[in-house]
Amino acid sequence: MSRIPLTSIEQQPEPVRQWMARRGNLKVFRLLANAPHVFPGWTQMVDELFESPTFSRRMREVVILRVAHLQGSRYELSQHVGIARNAGLTDQQINAILDTDHPDAAGFSDTERTALDVTSELCTTHRLRDDTFAAAQAVFGDEALTELLMIISCFYGLALVLNATDLDVDATARFQP
């Protein structure tokens, strides 16, 4: 049970209700809607991250699963493992992402391995070494690297909220990317 009560979907403004319905009417949205001055902007950012052509669904899910694992976010993992499969990740690759020490052992592309390295280092040390940053910048360029960092920060921050509030995993509802 969440440490903060979940809002009622019916009491939300129509645009928020529509967004929640489109994305799956999840408990996480009912939790975050407790911040009505911030939630609409957050939903817009999430939409932009999922609709941006910069990264494939597969790449986004590689990053999201790694963040969720490193942050111990049971909720994010429960929502995104299925999405990752639908985006083309194999169970072997998903298990490798969830392996703290060796996420690169399952046939990831060089670009995916670079994203995993950036995600792992940033989530565990809260910084990027110069060589890691330079390698990522060479692979992604400034625009895509910035977007990658924004994906990491979005799901890292969300994991903190979910872990702090101890939000229960939805029984059946799933996120609709």
Regions found by a protein language model. Give the residues of each.
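Hydrophobic alpha-helical segments
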Residues: 1-177
